[in-house]
A protein has these predicted regions:
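Conserved polymerase palm-domain catalytic core
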Residues: 3-100, 105-119, 123, 129, ...
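Right-hand nucleic-acid polymerase module
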Residues: 21, 57-61, 66, 85, ...
Length: 228
């Protein structure tokens, strides 16, 4: 994402926009028929049959999955795959990213993004999915936007400010607190707490997060007080 914003500034300056794409009720709305088509196209016949048998056994009806299993996560990645190709190859949007049901396109023209948004809306509708009316929107790069746990903002001078979303920090603090309670109760090893924090810290360190990480280091010390 940071690379796209820097490239947008080099090509067109700081006044560009981003189209944020979010699918409403994504996993609950995925059609089983579409999932089967995607897996059948990508997998050998014997593998496809096993995958379909598992999904058919676990999920009755024609739509909807629980996103907990790895197989369903793969379905979540694969279902919009033709739309990815449509956006990159037909619309020629060269600054496009998607993870599961969250996508983003960076472009210098708001009007172009408005046209693309309607075209993308129709593509999702064709496979039974609806774009979220509130979360799918166009924002100015200088105003900032949330994507994948970070808040991004492009300054007039072309610097990309990338900070951890406060919602992400709050969620992680709660997760660490619960883990610390389990460690104190002897139900989890101390290493589980360290590993969780190391993983999150590596992610947060990708942004402008020095002060935040300093505060989180102190928070970890507080959680570990009294733990041998």
């Amino acid at each position: 994402m940071k690379f796209f914003l820097e490239r947008e500034f080099r090509q067109h300056g700081p006044d560009g926009c981003a189209l944020l794409i979010d699918v409403h009720g994504y996993y609950a709305s995925i059609r089983h028929e579409i999932t089967n088509q995607r897996f059948e196209r990508k997998l050998p016949p014997s593998h496809y049959k096993r995958v379909r048998d598992v999904l058919d056994h676990q999920y009755s009806g024609e739509t909807g999955y629980n996103p907990g299993s790895q197989m369903v996560q793969l379905a979540g990645i694969s279902v919009p795959d033709p739309i990815d190709h449509y956006i990159k190859e037909r619309l020629r949007a060269d600054k496009y990213l998607r993870f599961m049901d969250d996508g983003i396109i960076v472009h210098h023209s708001k009007e172009q993004l408005e046209e693309w948004c309607e075209a993308i809306r129709q593509q999702y509708a064709a496979i039974g999915l609806e774009l979220h009316p509130r979360k799918t929107r166009i924002v100015r790069l200088q105003d900032g936007f949330r994507y994948m746990g970070f808040i991004y903002r492009l300054t007039p001078q072309g610097k990309v400010i990338m900070t951890v979303d406060p919602k992400n920090v709050k969620s992680e603090r709660k997760r660490l607190f619960r883990l610390a309670q389990l460690v104190k109760a002897g139900k989890k090893p101390k290493s589980a707490l360290y590993e969780q924090y190391r993983s999150w810290k590596a992610h947060a360190a990708k942004g402008n997060s020095d002060k935040l990480l300093g505060r989180m280091d102190e928070y970890i010390k507080t959680l570990l007080e009294g733990i041998p």
